[in-house]
């Protein structure tokens, strides 16, 4: 787990049975429920760029422990933000659980298999290059993404 940015949540809160609402700076665009994924979606290609790089995007994750609002670093990681937003809009995260919860430290989610292994590369079916150069510190409350090594987002 060399690089972190989105999907794996490093947040001091923990939750289960959640929903994600992807929001740009004007209006909500989608709501996703997180639990056990029943749709088993796999994609053949990385999504086309569909976000507006001039807008600010965020996600609202609703859990039975409360809500978490996540702001994305669109300028720093446009491919990663586009990936998360596109997958959320398509329902990819519907019923996906937080498979790892460490109280007071972090939660991890986004793996449809519910194991954290991603069925060893099956999900979502494509990879893309790393974007961050670690300019942003990983402080308390930062959301991040794990991968299997360089350029395996």
What are the functions of these language-model segments?
Residues 4-12:
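Sec-dependent N-terminal signal peptides
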Residues 14-153:
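Cyclophilin-like peptidyl-prolyl cis-trans isomerases
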């Amino acid at each position: 787990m060399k690089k972190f940015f989105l999907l794996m949540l490093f947040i001091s809160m923990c939750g289960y049975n959640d929903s994600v609402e992807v929001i740009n700076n004007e209006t909500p665009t989608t709501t996703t429920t997180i639990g056990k994924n029943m749709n088993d979606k796999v994609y053949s290609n990385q999504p086309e760029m569909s976000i507006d790089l001039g807008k600010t995007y965020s996600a609202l994750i609703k859990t039975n422990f409360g809500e978490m609002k996540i702001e994305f670093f669109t300028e720093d990681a446009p491919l990663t933000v586009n990936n998360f937003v596109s997958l959320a809009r398509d329902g990819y995260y519907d019923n996906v659980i937080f498979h790892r919860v460490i109280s007071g430290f972090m939660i991890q989610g986004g793996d449809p298999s519910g194991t954290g292994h991603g069925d060893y590369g099956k999900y979502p079916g494509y990879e893309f290059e790393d974007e961050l150069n670690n300019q942003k510190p990983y402080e308390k409350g930062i959301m991040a993404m794990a991968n299997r090594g360089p350029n395996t987002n």
